[in-house]
Amino acid sequence: MFAIIKTGGKQYKVSEGDIIKVEKIEAEAGDKIEFDQVLMVAGDDVKVGSPVVEGAKVSAEVLDQKKDKKIVIFKFKAKKNYRKKKGHRQPYTLVKIEKIDA
């Protein structure tokens, strides 16, 4: 059985036991969270929502809060000695999917 959930403006295909990396969620490690924006559930039969499946939810546990690898933004203008270097590390949350209720 798998489900497609929406969180942080992105969609993820999940099944029980999966560990996924999602946009930052305000929760501590060990907290239980629920995703109620379930777009599709598939098992023996397929339920597709419009836009979400009514009464469906996915239960998960927060494993960790981390930051992604650094990306470097470098701006310059040719022949003008204009240089700017900036870095960014996007925060994310590691989540373990525990149960899919359809």
From Swiss-Prot:
One of its GO terms (molecular function) is structural constituent of ribosome. This protein binds to 23S rRNA in the presence of protein L20. InterPro entries: bL21-like, bL21-like_sf, Ribosomal_bL21, Ribosomal_bL21_CS. It holds the Pfam family Ribosomal_L21p. Belongs to the bacterial ribosomal protein bL21 family. This is Large ribosomal subunit protein bL21. PROSITE patterns: RIBOSOMAL_L21. GO terms for cellular component: cytoplasm; ribonucleoprotein complex; ribosome. GO terms for biological process: translation. It comes from the Bacteria. Part of the 50S ribosomal subunit. Contacts protein L20. PANTHER family: 50S RIBOSOMAL PROTEIN L21, LARGE RIBOSOMAL SUBUNIT PROTEIN BL21M. Keywords: Ribonucleoprotein, Ribosomal protein, RNA-binding, rRNA-binding. It comes from Finegoldia magna (strain ATCC 29328 / DSM 20472 / WAL 2508). HAMAP family: Ribosomal_bL21 (MF_01363).
